[in-house]
């Protein structure tokens, strides 16, 4: 059998290796998605796929190997106080509960060292995460677990969560074994019990209502910091077109690499 024929054997495909096929079979038996954290079994992009574009006509090269490479990224440039990152990468939202206190604070320290931001994730703010983060997103989610307007005003940017790439349209689910007393206190819910976030926000029904909600958040933050919409990658063209009409400062299209809780 040739190499070309062999790559189409069951379980040897790059897109559908054995782990992916087993996952499909398990979900077909269950009739629903699996209750698990972490990423997909499917092959996904890695850090090795990041590419710096070289100069040609649009970025004319003066002298080889001496050109500056600028990685500064500005989120919400039209906001009175835009969020400036030294690199086009930041630590996305992962809740306290899905991650431990040690992990959250370590990521905050690392993000500060790299000149970039971290995000609270759902469930509210850990004071030490905010203290160690020089640049910090506060995430507003469907369930409003842990939401505190005073913490909102401490943020450098607000991330209004509509969906995430690994489970578009499914809301959130934090397993009971991760709901410690501290997590439960932050979310005003009982410890040791599974906690679910609904798939949609309860106080707006569409893009027009969402625009009003964004104005409400903008008023709460004195109109100073950027407001970002987080969308799971689905009908990207249509979703972005509608999101752009809501008056948000930036739009974040989330891939399927995540899935912490």
PLM regions and their residue ranges:
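Short linear interaction motifs
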Residues: 140-142
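Hydrophobic/aromatic residues located in beta-strands of well-ordered beta-sheets
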Residues: 118, 136-138, 227
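Conserved, well-structured core domains of diverse proteins
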Residues: 1-89, 93, 98-112, 116-117, ...
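Alpha/beta enzyme core
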Residues: 109, 130-132, 144-261
């Amino acid at each position: 059998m040739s190499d070309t024929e062999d790559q189409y054997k069951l379980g040897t495909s790059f897109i559908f290796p054995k782990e992916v096929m087993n996952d499909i079979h398990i979900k077909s038996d269950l009739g629903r998605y699996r209750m698990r954290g972490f990423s997909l079994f499917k092959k996904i992009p890695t850090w090795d796929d990041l590419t710096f574009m070289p100069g040609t006509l649009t970025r004319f090269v003066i002298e080889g190997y001496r050109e500056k490479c600028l990685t500064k990224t500005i989120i919400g440039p039209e906001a009175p106080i835009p969020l400036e990152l030294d690199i086009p990468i930041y630590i996305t939202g992962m809740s306290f509960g899905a991650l431990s206190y040690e992990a959250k604070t370590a990521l905050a320290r690392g993000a500060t060292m790299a000149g970039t931001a971290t995000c609270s994730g759902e469930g509210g703010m850990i004071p030490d995460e905010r203290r160690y983060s020089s640049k910090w997103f506060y995430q507003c989610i469907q369930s409003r677990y842990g939401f505190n307007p005073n913490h909102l005003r401490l943020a450098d940017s607000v991330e209004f969560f509509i969906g995430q790439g690994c489970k578009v349209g499914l809301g959130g689910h934090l397993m009971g074994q991760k709901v410690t007393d501290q997590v439960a206190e932050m979310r005003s819910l009982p410890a040791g019990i599974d906690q679910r976030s609904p798939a949609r926000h309860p106080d707006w029904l569409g893009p027009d209502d969402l625009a009003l909600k964004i104005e409400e958040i903008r008023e709460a933050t004195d109109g100073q910091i950027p407001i970002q919409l987080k969308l799971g990658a689905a009908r990207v063209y249509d979703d972005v077109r509608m999101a752009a009409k809501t008056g948000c400062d930036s739009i974040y299209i989330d891939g399927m690499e995540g899935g912490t809780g």
